[in-house]
Structures are given as C-alpha cells and as structure tokens.
Swiss-Prot record:
GO cellular component, one term: cytoplasm
Quaternary structure annotation from Swiss-Prot or TrEMBL: Heptamer of 7 subunits arranged in a ring. Interacts with the chaperonin GroEL.
The protein's name: Co-chaperonin GroES
PANTHER family noted in UniProt: 10 KDA HEAT SHOCK PROTEIN (PTHR10772), CO-CHAPERONIN GROES (PTHR10772:SF58)
Family per similarity comment: Belongs to the GroES chaperonin family.
Primary site of residence: cytoplasm
Gene transcribed to yield this protein: groES
Length: 87
C-alpha cells in the first residue's frame, strides 16, 4: 500500500528511541521529553521542495498524526514541524 501526502506534508518512518545509553545507563522517560525524535522521510507532499524521500530528519517529539499502512507505523507531519535534516 502506498500513501502520497498532499501539500506541505511528509510521511516519516520514525526511528525507535532507546532509553538506554551505550554504556548501559537507563534514562527515565521523563528525562528525554524535550529531545526531538528522528526518522526517515518515506514520501513527500506535492509542495515540498527542501526535503526528499530518504532524508533523515529531526522533528518535534509529539508532532504529527500516526498512520498504519500494512504492518508498519508512520507519521504524517507538516513540513514546518521538521526541525532539520541530519547529515
């Protein structure tokens, strides 16, 4: 199943956030609330010209609407909620 966002929206596959550091320290949920989320852009809307499919981006943690296609979960975000491209 395919989804094409309209206007200035993007479809993002969110990366799983780890609550444990590389050294094994567990970070409580309330300690990382202000940290932005990251994900990969899967599809871009018809009016998006500054990002493209495949870009890894940072976005506000609680932004967007969840969408399930098949067995995968995605987020639909307004382009203005994307904070930047991670290179």
């Amino acid at each position: 199943m395919k989804f094409q966002p309209l206007g200035k929206r993007v479809l993002i596959e969110r990366e799983e956030e780890s609550n444990k550091t590389a050294s094994g320290i567990i970070i409580p949920d309330n300690a990382s609330k202000e940290k932005p989320s990251t994900g990969k852009i899967v599809e871009v809307g018809t009016e998006c010209d500054c990002v493209k499919a495949g870009d890894k981006v940072a976005f506000a943690k609680y932004s967007g609407s969840e969408l399930t296609l098949g067995d995968k979960k995605y987020l639909i975000l307004n382009l203005e909620d994307v904070l930047g491209i991670i290179k």
